[in-house]
Every structure is written in structure tokens, then in C-alpha cells.
Amino acid sequence: VKRSKIGFGFVALAAAGALALSGCASGGGSNGGGDAGAGIITVNNTEPQKGLIPADTTEVGGGKVVDALWEGLVYYDADGVTQMGVAESIESDDNITWTVNLRDDAVFSDGTPVLAHNFVDAWNYAANIDNAMGNQYFFSAIKGFSETEPVEALEGLKVIDDHTFTIEATPDFPDRLGYSAYYPLPDVAFEDMEAFGQSPIGNGLYKLDGEGAWKHDESISLVKNDTYVGPREVSNEGIDFKVYASLDAAYTDLLAGNLDVLDQIPDTSFAVFEDELGDRAINQAGALTTTLAISTSLPHFGMDEEGKLRRAALSMAVDREEIIDVIFEGTNVPAVDFTSPVVDGFADDLAGKEKLEFNLDEAKKLWAEADAISPFEGTVEVATNSDGPHQVWIEAVANQWATNLGISAAPKLYPTFAAFLDDREADVVGGPFRAGWQGDYPGAYNYMQPLYYTGASSNHGFYANPAFDAKLDEAINAASHEERNEKLNEAQEILLEDMPSIPLWYQGTTGGYSEGVDNVVFGWNSVPIFNEITKN
């Protein structure tokens, strides 16, 4: 008897859940940029690092836009429940081979139908190493995937008919299907993928507002997609994503009524935003984690005895509680692991978690032991981007390291998030760097595989440990949910031994909205559910 693994009400985590944005559509007006027109909501954003290709978008500036332009097989609602999107059903009788049946009324915004081959072609393209997609690793669970050799067509994907295809993959694979890497692509995308990324055609709740809708470093203007037919509805006429050089500037615009929704409060306003915004302030639990990653190629910080001693010393020299109380006004929670408390399987008793606790004497001792192996000279520079809300706490961490370890430590600031990411990917940052993570889909695996698996695209510390990789592989092939969580926790204990990054805190979701909008709800991943927002 077939049983549906993915269906209405399936929850992938303990208390969370929405990554895709939502809506149903009727015709939208025109708003080619600049001031938003009637019914258009304005939202803060950062400039996307790359073109708007779902399988190549790995940061939130592009991710928010991609999720508004597309709809996947499923989506996660604001409470973490998996709901059907383009899929009518996803069924398996063995947890290995999945049959996907699509709705027959789904279309792209250019009017072409969304068919089974649009998913299969998009996935094959993303999985092929020759295409260098940032989310390639999300297809590693499908039979036939290769990390090293180009594969034109995955053995585990088969088109049955226009509205049916099958997937042969690991048992946990369906949990991820709401993530943007799995969105379909229209045939036209493959004619010139780079050009497509600048003017994408999706099948979601919104579409680009005509030619020139993406004004680089300024704004991205979307309107309701009048071709969308699906389970969700849009309560506004569109979204104007406004690119800001700093969150302070965005917050000032919010207070002045020049911005409708701000999805992150700057650290300089934590003490006052709830008083200034009143019941329009958002302060809730989230699934964002903040860490400091350290490249394994950085002298004195490699994956040898000296490097592990220094990594542990830096971690134990940070007084997380003090920074959270003074800078974040208590809105964050000190980290005790590498995932998030809102995901299923979270454990706060992992072996090695003492490395995440403030212990000044032990930190000094470990640093001295490392110096006995190879003396450290120079300055520990801790890096972040200055167009985000991080400069103040980065300075606090540097000051604590200097005071507590008696070393030279200082911030290193990049002007933009894109420039910061470029240097991380090129392995030229030259010191510890901020490496926060927002869940792509509701699951603990997603907080480890993209960041720490050998060769993963967001593994900007270039960590490689075959034992850790093997534990993750065991987890995704586990026969039961309980066994999967057990293997994931064992993998975390390897991370706590090696410390490829320094977990700092679980970031609360703080935001706000203007008097010009209503029905503002933030999902589990701290992204507003844009389609539900109404313009007054």
C-alpha cells in the first residue's frame, strides 16, 4: 500500500517552518522602481550576490527574491508544516523511490506550462558539476550524483509523462523539497542561463515588473503574477525590494514611513525599537545561528593540535551572555551546538559543548599551549560586512579576545555582503569571520552539510573530515527518524572536537513594519510571509 510521505500536515521539525514565500495572483500594476505604487509593499534587502537562478542562490538577499518568484513541489508554511505547491502528491512505498504527480494548471509567468521535465531538467542542470551551481550538493541524495564527474542526467530522475516523474533518493530527501534549489526552470532558461538570471521567469506568486525591474544596488521590483494558479493567495499588488547600505538607514526609513517592512533590526536600535514601534515590533524565536568560521588554511589555525587549541581558546574567551545582554538586549540565546533549538532532534547535552562556554582560565591555558607549539604573532582580525547589523558585536568579540587572551585583535570590515562573500569563497579573508546561517529547509542536517561537509558550497572554512562526512552520510540513509537524529548528534560531536567554526548564539527574529501595512507575519526562518501582507 502506498503511503504519502509528503502531504498536508507533515512537519519536518519540532516547532518551526516556512522558507518559500506565498500567494495566488491577479493582475498587478506597473512599478518599474523608485517609489512604490499603490498596493506595492516596500521591503529592505541586500544586493544579490549572483543572478537570480534558484540553484545558484545561496544568500538571503537573492533568496528572498527567488522565493517570491517561484513555487516548488511543496512549501513550508509559517508554522513549519509542509504544504503542497506544484505537487498534487509525492508518494513512496519504500522510502527510496518517490512518484511525484503535478497539478495540471501550474504555469510559468510567461504562460508556458510547468511540466515534469521542467523539474527534472532543472535538477539535472544543477547537479552537473560543469555548471558550477552553488546548490549542487542539494542533489547528492539522488542516485547517480557525482561530486567530481559531470553527469548530464541523473539516474535517479525519470520523466513518466507531462505531469509525473520519479525520484530515486535517500529516505530523508522529501524533507528538503520546499527549498529553492528544487524549483523548476522554463525551457528558455537553458538558452542562456546567465542572461536568465538577470531577468528570470518563475512560476510563483510574483514576477519581475517588466524590463529593468532589477536596478542593481538600488532595488528589485516585483508585481503579482497574474498567471499563478495554486494553493496560496496574494494580498498586495507587489514587492519593492529596496537595497540598503546599512540596516540603520533602513530603520530610519521605517520610522519615517518610507519603508513598509524591515526584517532585521540594527543592533544600534535593540534597546529602543519595541518602544518606538509598539505593537508593530517583531521579537520572536528564529532559526538563525551566528558563528565565527576560521579557514583551515589560516596559519596557526589549521586542523592540527595547535589550530584546534587556538580555536577552542577563542571560543572559550567569548563571554556570549555579556554580549547578548549588552548589545542584543537579551534577544539572542547562547549557542550550545551547531544547529538551532527549533529543529527536530536538537540536543543540549553533546560531548564537547563546554568549548562553547565562557571559561577565561581554560581559554588562557589553551592559548598558551598553542603558543608552546608555535608562537602566534600579529593581530587576529575578525571580519564581517558593514552593510549588515554586525559591526558592534564583532568589535565586542575582538575586544574580549584582546582583553581575555592578551593578544592583538581587531575588526575587519567589508563594505558589502557580496564583497565579504567573494573573499570568503576565495579563502582570502585572513582571520575568523562571521558565518551566520539561516535554514534553507526545516532540518538539522541543513545546518551541517552545507557548512561543513567536504567541498560543500557554503563551507567557506574549507573544513574536511572524512569521519564527519561519513556520519552525515549515515544520517541521511538511516532507516528511522530516531536513528537519523542520533547520527546527526554524533556528527556534531566531531564538530565540537574540531571546531571548524565557533558557534556564538541563536539569533532571535527582530523586525518591524510601518503604519502603512497590516497582517505582517514572520516565518520560522525570519523571513516575512510577503504574500499575506496588506497595504493600508
Predicted regions and their residues:
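N-terminal lobe/hinge region of extracytoplasmic solute-binding protein
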Residues: 44-94, 201
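Surface-exposed binding/hinge segments that line
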Residues: 91, 134-189
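Alpha-helical secondary-structure segments
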Residues: 115-124, 162-168, 205, 236-238, ...
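Gly/Pro-rich hinge or "lid" segments in bacterial periplasmic/extracellular proteins
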Residues: 172-234, 238
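Ligand-site clamp/hinge motif
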Residues: 194-195, 200, 227-272, 287
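Extracytoplasmic/peripheral linker and loop segments enriched in polar/acidic and small residues
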Residues: 324, 408-420, 446-514, 536
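Structural transition elements
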Residues: 333-370, 387-392
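Long beta-strand-rich cores associated with HINT superfamily self-processing modules
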Residues: 511-536
